[in-house]
Curated annotation (Swiss-Prot):
Positions of the catalytic residues: 154 (proton acceptor)
Protein residues bound to substrate: 141
Biotech use, per record: The reverse reaction is of biotechnological interest for the specific production of chiral alcohols from ketones.
GO biological process: anaerobic ethylbenzene catabolic process; protein homotetramerization
Record InterPro entries: NAD(P)-bd_dom_sf (IPR036291), SDR (IPR050259), SDR_fam (IPR002347)
Pfam families tied to this protein: adh_short_C2
Family: Belongs to the short-chain dehydrogenases/reductases (SDR) family.
Organism of this sequence: Aromatoleum aromaticum (strain DSM 19018 / LMG 30748 / EbN1)
Function field: Catalyzes the NAD-dependent stereospecific oxidation of (S)-1-phenylethanol to acetophenone in the degradation of ethylbenzene.
Gene name per UniProt: ped
Keyword terms of this UniProt record: NAD, Nucleotide-binding, Oxidoreductase
Molecular function (Gene Ontology), one example: oxidoreductase activity, acting on the CH-OH group of donors, NAD or NADP as acceptor
Assembly and interaction partners: Homotetramer.
Protein name: (S)-1-Phenylethanol dehydrogenase
Gene3D superfamilies (alphabetical): NAD(P)-binding Rossmann-like Domain
Amino acid sequence: MTQRLKDKLAVITGGANGIGRAIAERFAVEGADIAIADLVPAPEAEAAIRNLGRRVLTVKCDVSQPGDVEAFGKQVISTFGRCDILVNNAGIYPLIPFDELTFEQWKKTFEINVDSGFLMAKAFVPGMKRNGWGRIINLTSTTYWLKIEAYTHYISTKAANIGFTRALASDLGKDGITVNAIAPSLVRTATTEASALSAMFDVLPNMLQAIPRLQVPLDLTGAAAFLASDDASFITGQTLAVDGGMVRH
């Protein structure tokens, strides 16, 4: 495999498990060192990245809290000296019918799914600007284009992710920084397996996808590595649907 990210430093939120961990390990294979921000420990991700010969930092961090993100940013810079790639992957996705949705639940979903990306960008974009190079990848969702019930709060955050991607790309293009988003389908992870979403595992791929199998985190890693590399240096402001052909636009 190529080393397109040789000696880059990638920050990944929610990198302890699932999609974030898969992207972290792929970036390490591509030659990057990794900094993970997550609320839970990441011993398996750490071990895998170290076994690939790369440096890794994992920090307990509530990515929705400005103080936590500021402290995390300082620790990353003191450890590695810079951040080249930022992957805003952390998110929550509880199914809640609109009639039952409280304002507190709405706010929490936005804080974790949207505010975190803003806070992380504020922490690391200044350094990217100084270096004249940077990559920001935001994880969104194909649910933005679909009819999905009990997801008003979540889909609203995913629309915000796409808008943030497009707008921030306009601000940062002159600084050598690209900003793109990846929109997966329903992905099998330990978290989704333990949630109400698991009821759709056997239904959704056959009903809506051209490739009729359930998506796994590994399916997203190639797209992420591409967007993080110089191969995608003239691509910005885009949302790439990596979803087995569910959405076509």
